[in-house]
């Protein structure tokens, strides 16, 4: 077995408002049980994560944008990798539910639902044509899920997108998994997948094994987003990108909060409307978050009723309490900021109330993989409790 050390450390930071913020940081992503030299660490670009609090496992998406990515879905056992205590730093392992690492072709985002299923969207192709591209299966995009409650995480869902609905799968953004009744058999589940190029939502009805696309003017970008690097200003334009789900009503429906990647406005729509194939959407404008505060990822916390935003160019994580309407800048606040938190790419609240957020320094700009930083570009941070994260801020109803 070949094991080697990664440029990976777990550090303890002090948040801007005093909350203890634990975090991982990488200069390069390196793999366990993979022969050094068989892959190029510079090609390993992680875009998103999911954390299973019950199993204490961290799952990372590493899309096959560039050649020789060993595993597009990687895993870290955080229970046995106590980096805070400063001993051994874990490498990335193959996902426990896989035998070869080629079971998935390329993913951008993992999501864990309320039934402890890990969901991914396999875009079905690699994004290069050089040597080795044919080593991975090519197929229509697929929604795949694994049961984290079972040993070895068996695959329990695989649904291929209908050909008529496949359009630019490399432009899928974030997605949300909506379980109507987590205390039931979990069969009544919907998946809402954003497409930030087309400005559309792909909706999958798991129980009926059906799917469809919906569009709406609120899914479009408002104007280009600006990103600063190396003294130069770059621009990108992204439609609907982030989506998160609020509290359920008695019928299992809830608000779906969403935003475009190039926008400051936030909207909500009732999932009852999303679940009706061919139905009409009636979104509500909740307000705007303030100039230059564009974000591609957001996460709702049911305990505090707060939505957290990982921002694109401000190097910060912000918050807004949904009980403070309307959404406007004076009702928002900052829970974390760092000059090294470059391009917030993912954020989530785990099942035990921990707030996680990630930056990777890779905005959706052509050749951003060539951007160089003199510090670890990948940062995955955690504040142990969401109430602690917002204490004393405008998002704290008790302040």
Curated annotation (Swiss-Prot):
Residues 1-18 form the signal peptide. Pfam families: MRJP. It is found in: Secreted. Keywords: Allergen, Disulfide bond, Glycoprotein, Secreted, Signal. Vaccination against the protein protects mice from different Leishmania species, such as Leishmania major and Leishmania braziliensis, when infection occurs in the presence of L.longipalpis salivary gland homogenates or after L.longipalpis bites. Probably modulates blood feeding of sand flies on vertebrate species by binding and sequestering different mediators involved in the host response. Binds biogenic amines. Binds serotonin with high affinity. Binds adrenaline and noradrenaline. Binds dopamine and octopamine. Poorly binds histamine. Induces a delayed type hypersensitivity response in host tissues. Induces systemic Th1 immune response in the host. Immunogenic; elicits antibody production in the host. (Microbial infection) Modulates infection caused by Leishmania species in the host. This is Yellow-related salivary protein LJM11. It comes from Lutzomyia longipalpis.
């Amino acid at each position: 077995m070949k094991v080697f050390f990664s440029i990976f450390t777990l550090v303890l930071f002090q948040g801007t408002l005093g909350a203890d913020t634990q975090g991982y940081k990488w200069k390069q992503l390196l793999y366990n049980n993979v022969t050094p030299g068989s892959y190029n660490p510079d090609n390993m670009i992680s875009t998103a994560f999911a954390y299973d609090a019950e199993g204490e496992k961290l799952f990372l998406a590493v899309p096959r944008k560039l050649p020789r990515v060993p595993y597009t879905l990687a895993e870290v056992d955080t229970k046995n990798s106590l980096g805070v205590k400063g001993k051994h730093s874990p490498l990335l392992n193959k996902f426990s539910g896989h035998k070869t690492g080629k079971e998935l072709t390329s993913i951008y985002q993992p999501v864990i639902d309320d039934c402890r299923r890990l969901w991914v969207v396999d875009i079905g192709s690699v994004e290069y044509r050089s040597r080795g591209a044919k080593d991975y299966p090519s197929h229509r995009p697929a929604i795949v899920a694994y049961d984290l409650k079972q040993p070895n995480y068996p695959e329990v869902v695989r649904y291929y997108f209908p050909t008529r609905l496949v359009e630019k799968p490399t432009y899928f953004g974030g997605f949300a998994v909506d379980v109507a009744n987590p205390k039931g058999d979990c069969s009544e589940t919907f998946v809402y997948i954003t497409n930030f190029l087309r400005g559309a939502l792909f909706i999958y009805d798991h129980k009926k094994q059906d799917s469809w696309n919906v569009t709406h003017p609120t899914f479009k970008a408002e104007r280009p987003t600006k990103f600063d690097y190396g003294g130069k200003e770059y621009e990108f334009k992204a439609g609907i990108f982030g989506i998160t789900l609020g509290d359920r009503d008695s019928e299992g429906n809830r608000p779906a909060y969403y935003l475009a990647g190039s926008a400051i406005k936030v909207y909500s729509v009732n999932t009852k409307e999303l679940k009706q194939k061919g139905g009409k959407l009636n979104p509500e404008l909740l307000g705007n978050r303030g100039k230059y505060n564009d974000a591609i990822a957001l996460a709702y916390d049911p305990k505090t009723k707060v939505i957290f935003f990982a921002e694109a160019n401000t190097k910060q994580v912000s918050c807004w309490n949904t009980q403070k309407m309307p959404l406007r800048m004076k009702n928002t606040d900052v829970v974390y900021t760092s000059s090294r938190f470059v391009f917030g790419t993912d954020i989530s609240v785990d099942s035990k109330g921990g707030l996680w957020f990630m930056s990777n320094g890779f905005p959706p700009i052509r050749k951003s993989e060539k951007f160089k930083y003199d510090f670890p570009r990948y940062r995955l941070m955690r504040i142990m409790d969401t109430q602690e994260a917002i204490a004393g801020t405008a998002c704290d109803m008790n302040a």
